[in-house]
Every structure is written in C-alpha cells, then in structure tokens.
C-alpha cells in the first residue's frame, strides 16, 4: 500500500518544495527542519491506522474516558540521512523504542555500488509495529535489506516506511519483495537514473542535512 501525502493540498507540499529548491536547501538547519516536519505529518497520519484503547483518566473534577494509543511503535532509521525524519516521528511517538541501522551505498570505481549494512541497534521487534524513516526511496535496495535484517531480529506485525521523496521504480521493487508494508511518501517522482538517483528529486539528503561526506 502506498500513500502519497502530497495528493491532498497541505503545508507538507511547501516543505517538499523547499527541500527541492537549490536556493533554499543550502540552509542546513531549514533542510533538517523540513524533513522533521514531514516526519511529524507522517506520524500523525500513521497514528490514524494504529490500535487505540479506551482508558479512564482522572481529572481534577472527575473521570474522563479517553482513547489512547494501545502501544507505541518501534521507530527505526537508516543513518545518517534518516535522522531528521526520524526526529519528526519521535516528536509525536514520544515514548517509542528506537532502532538505528547503518546502511549505505558503497561505491565502486566503475560507478556501481553495493548496499553495505555495518551496524544495527534495535529493541525487541516481535509482534510490534515498526516505522522506518529514510528520506529517499530510490532503488529500494537499502530499505529492503534493512527490512530483511530487522525480520531476522523479530517478526513485526506491521511495517510502515516513511520517505520524503520516492521513485516509482523503488516503490515497485519494495512492493514486490515486501508486499505487506505500507509506504508513506511526501512526494513521488517518476525517473531514476542509471546511477540510482531520483529525478528531479532533491540531491543527496545526507549531505544537505549534515555536510558532504568522503567516500572510502
């Protein structure tokens, strides 16, 4: 299931436009904050499909029966680019357990790349709802590898993926390999280059958020 959050008019479209803009995206603090805002919107929308329960709450004047989230999800992010988006999710799911995954493109001299997964830290995942934050869904390779690794650690009952910008090629790849996940997108682009970059996209989200990295 794919949900394009830009299908309806909202402030989210403004934030996506600023992420894309070469005039605005050079402001790193603003870039990170816009990713964080998209994470907040996604958290609110995801909360609508999670399980709630009624709970009696004592007020100064009596008892109120309130609907509260039955269980906090596990929030997972792919380092480093996913951190601002993850923070947006965490602002709303503020008592959630967290998982961190180091998955990145290890580039070869010929321009090709492999997905390297070097580090994972995660809580118990068995029968939990997992929300994975990754700002760009391009080929989908790193996301699928991350999901497969998390499944080895436990068996989540639901997996949600939150991305700022996705490519249709990557969406289709994830849906073929992980048909039961829900993908929440800030925007969807059609083109993917031979080197695995989304067009028009926004560039390298990790570099824009935290500075240019050195390839080892």
Language-model-detected regions and their locations in the chain:
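PRPP-associated nucleotide enzymes
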Residues: 1-216
């Amino acid at each position: 299931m794919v949900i394009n959050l830009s299908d309806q008019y909202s402030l989210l479209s403004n934030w996506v436009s600023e992420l894309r803009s070469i005039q605005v995206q050079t402001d790193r603090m603003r870039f990170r904050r816009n990713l964080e805002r998209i994470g907040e919107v996604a958290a609110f929308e995801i909360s609508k499909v999670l399980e709630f329960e009624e709970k009696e709450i004592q007020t100064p004047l009596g008892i109120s029966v309130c609907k509260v989230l039955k269980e906090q999800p596990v929030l997972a992010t792919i380092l480093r680019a996913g951190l601002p988006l993850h923070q947006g999710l965490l602002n709303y799911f503020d008592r959630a357990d967290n998982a961190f995954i180091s998955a990145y493109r290890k580039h070869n001299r010929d321009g090709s790349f492999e997905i390297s997964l070097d580090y994972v830290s995660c809580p118990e995942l068995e029968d939990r709802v997992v929300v994975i934050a990754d700002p760009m869904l391009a080929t989908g390779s790193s996301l699928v590898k991350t999901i497969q690794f998390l499944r080895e650690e436990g068996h989540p009952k639901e997996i949600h993926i939150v991305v700022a910008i996705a490519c249709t090629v990557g969406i289709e790849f994830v849906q073929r390999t992980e048909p039961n996940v829900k993908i929440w997108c800030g925007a969807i682009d059609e083109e993917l280059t031979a080197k695995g970059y989304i067009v028009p996209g926004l560039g390298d989200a990790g570099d824009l958020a935290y500075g240019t990295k050195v390839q080892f």
